[in-house]
Curated annotation (Swiss-Prot):
Source species, domain of life: Bacteria
GO molecular function: ATP binding; metal ion binding; NAD binding; NAD+ kinase activity
Role noted for this protein: Involved in the regulation of the intracellular balance of NAD and NADP, and is a key enzyme in the biosynthesis of NADP. Catalyzes specifically the phosphorylation on 2'-hydroxyl of the adenosine moiety of NAD to yield NADP.
Protein name listed in UniProt: NAD kinase 1
UniProt record, GO biological process: NAD metabolic process; NADP biosynthetic process
Similarity comment text for this entry: Belongs to the NAD kinase family.
Gene3D superfamilies on file: Probable inorganic polyphosphate/atp-NAD kinase, domain 1, Probable inorganic polyphosphate/atp-NAD kinase, domain 2
Cofactor(s) named in the record: a divalent metal cation
Compartment annotation: Cytoplasm
Enzyme class: transferase
This protein's encoding gene: nadK1
Species name: Prochlorococcus marinus (strain NATL2A)
Keywords: ATP-binding, Cytoplasm, Kinase, NAD, NADP, Nucleotide-binding, Transferase
Residues the record marks as active site: 67
Length: 302
């Protein structure tokens, strides 16, 4: 990492994130680094402009926002293997972000300028939507990457929002789901939508794919964890009047029509997450974020 270039991406709807961006830029430039920055949101993608402006890739990218901002940034930065250092500025839970107060510490900036930090590799998923043609050949309709999850849900407003989906894993029929949809999650995303749907929490150092049904009509439809090399194929059950949409990390993907097939698998790309704490504990993170064991950490609480 000797390019002396650092990017900053900030949450577009946060004045605080923009002000923090200007402060960070000033400090980083004081260490002899060049800084380029841009806003990021669901509606606008200015990251490609940074790629065009930069003759070299950045050493790291600082992301100022919440987990959603990090997820959006990861889709563009991970294929280039650019490490992400994120801070919770205007976000919510912040499983992927550091406390923004760290930005005020002079020792922090010295560590960043000298590349004194750890990097965690986080598994990503890839989804490819195929369209079946009359000659039974499939053509690629769309491809997407996600750090947290993909999910398929009904997008019909006129009738009850349920959908019927068939799932195959490695060529073997597994289940036919009827309900609000299906979630396909990484271990990083296991504390997001999948957890809300009753899925297990998986340590992010593991590679696995979690399949969780959203409000299934059958009590037999339970979450399942499959190996990372699994090939998961999802097809709308034909003959049903339904419109289904693929979502990635909470952002709109594309419509899945009756003649479409969606293949979900582990991506060849991974997200590089910078961890500043040398004694970082994932269990401490989820205990704090999910308020577990509060009576153990606070002996005065009964």
């Amino acid at each position: 990492m000797t390019t002396n270039l650092i990017w900053i991406l900030y949450r577009s709807d946060s004045d605080t994130a923009y002000k923090e961006t200007l402060n960070c830029k000033k400090i980083i430039e004081g260490y002899g680094k060049k800084v380029l920055f841009s806003e990021i949101s669901n509606e606008t993608n200015n990251i490609n402009q940074l790629f065009l402006k930069s003759e070299v890739l950045p050493e790291i990218t600082i992301v100022l926002g919440g987990d959603g901002t990090v997820l959006r940034a990861a889709r563009y930065l991970s294929p280039k293997n650019i490490p992400i250092l994120s801070f919770n500025v205007g976000g919510n839970l912040g499983f992927l972000t550091h406390d923004r107060q760290i930005l005020k510490q002079e020792t922090f900036w010295e560590r960043v300028s000298n590349n004194r930090f750890n990097i965690q590799k986080r598994m990503m998923l890839e989804a490819t939507v195929f369209r079946e043609k009359n000659n039974n050949e499939n053509t690629i309709k769309k491809s997407f990457f996600a750090l947290n999850d993909f999910y398929l849900r009904s997008c019909t407003d006129e009738i009850a929002p349920t959908c019927s989906l068939a799932l195959e894993i490695d060529g073997e029929a597994v289940d036919r789901y009827k309900g609000d949809g299906l979630i396909f999650s990484t271990p990083t995303g296991s504390t997001a939508y999948s957890m809300a749907a009753g899925g297990p929490i998986i340590h992010p150092s593991l590679d696995a794919i979690i399949v969780s049904a959203i409000c299934p009509m059958s009590l037999a439809s339970r979450p399942i964890v499959v190996p990372p090399e699994s090939q998961l194929v999802i097809k709308p059950i034909r003959g049903m009047k339904q419109k289904i949409k693929l979502w990635l990390d909470g952002s709109s993907g594309c419509l899945i029509e009756a003649e479409d097939t969606c293949l979900i698998k582990k991506s060849n790309h991974s997200t590089s997450i910078i961890i500043l704490d040398e004694n970082h504990s994932y269990y401490k993170t989820i205990t704090q974020k999910l308020h577990w064991a509060s009576s153990l950490n606070n002996p005065n609480k009964q």
